């Protein structure tokens, strides 16, 4: 199977850079420092107008755990309807029980809303209690792929688990490695695990055009983020990653 590179895009501009670099598809997210949250309808619409490659949108109403209230599930269902109406090809979500298991009721509601779309179970998988059992549940539910770091802080650290999951999957579901994937380790991961799907942001920082600055003021309060630069996917880095994967 051909190698696939999914770019975690934080904006419509990053989506355009991903396509220019030759990415297979993008996952469009807001709130990347929080692990990704659902982007605005405006961001989705602009992204869709800019690129032709598939766009998968994360359906995650907030940061934190993956146990959701009935109100949050209702909002997620609504977001899936918006994503579909804007012509996106797929959605990315995952709901867990308080015990770290597969939340049958919550996931079933979202799956029903997303019927006919591409379905990715996101890194909620990495904090589940029993990953091999969870994988079988995802296969039975009809997910097309699972995004995972191998239940480790980074995909490189979880490469043995990723390889084991890939062997268990036997082609029934795609195993897509994500978290900390860089130009310097993507080939190692591919050769060690045997997987063919990779997820990376491949971003660089673009300096702010602001000339007047108050660097001591942070919009995140006590959370210090550089307010005078913004990360954006680099088409050149994407192209390099694609070349590496095609050479394997």
Swiss-Prot record:
Q: Which GO terms describe its molecular function?
A: copper ion binding
Q: Which Pfam families match?
A: CutC
Q: Which InterPro entries match?
A: CutC-like (IPR005627), CutC-like_dom_sf (IPR036822)
Give the GO cellular component terms, alphabetically: cytoplasm
The protein's UniProt keywords, in alphabetical order, are: Cytoplasm
Source domain of life: Bacteria
Q: Does the keyword Cytoplasm apply?
A: yes
Q: Where in the cell is it found?
A: Cytoplasm
| Keyword Cytoplasm among UniProt keywords | yes
As for family, the record states: Belongs to the CutC family.
What is the name of this protein? Answer: PF03932 family protein CutC
Q: Which organism is it from?
A: Porphyromonas gingivalis (strain ATCC BAA-308 / W83)
The major lineage groups are:
Bacteria, Pseudomonadati, Bacteroidota, Bacteroidia, Bacteroidales
Q: What gene does the UniProt entry assign to this protein?
A: cutC
């Amino acid at each position: 199977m051909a190698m696939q590179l999914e770019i975690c895009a934080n904006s419509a501009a990053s989506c355009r850079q991903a396509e220019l670099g030759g990415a297979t598809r993008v996952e469009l997210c807001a709130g990347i420092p929080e692990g990704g949250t659902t982007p605005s309808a405006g961001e989705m619409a602009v992204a869709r107008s800019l690129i032709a490659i598939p766009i998968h949108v994360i359906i995650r109403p907030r940061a934190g755990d993956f146990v959701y209230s009935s109100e949050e599930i209702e909002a997620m269902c609504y977001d899936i309807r918006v994503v579909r109406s804007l012509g996106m090809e797929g959605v990315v979500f995952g709901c867990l029980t308080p015990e770290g298991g597969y939340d049958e009721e919550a996931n079933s509601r979202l799956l029903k809303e997303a019927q006919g779309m591409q379905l990715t179970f996101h890194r909620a998988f990495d904090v589940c209690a029993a990953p091999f059992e969870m994988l079988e549940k995802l296969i039975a539910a009809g997910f097309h792929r699972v995004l995972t770091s191998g239940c480790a802080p980074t995909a490189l650290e979880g490469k043995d688990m990723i390889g084991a999951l890939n062997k268990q999957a036997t082609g029934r579901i795609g195993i897509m490695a994500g978290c900390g994937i860089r130009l310097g380790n993507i080939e190692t991961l591919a050769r060690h695990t045997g997987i063919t799907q990779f997820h990376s942001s491949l971003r660089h920082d673009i300096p702010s055009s602001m000339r007047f600055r108050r660097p001591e003021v942070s919009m995140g309060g006590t959370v210090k983020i550089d307010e005078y630069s913004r990360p954006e996917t680099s088409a050149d880095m994407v192209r390099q990653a694609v070349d590496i994967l095609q050479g394997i």
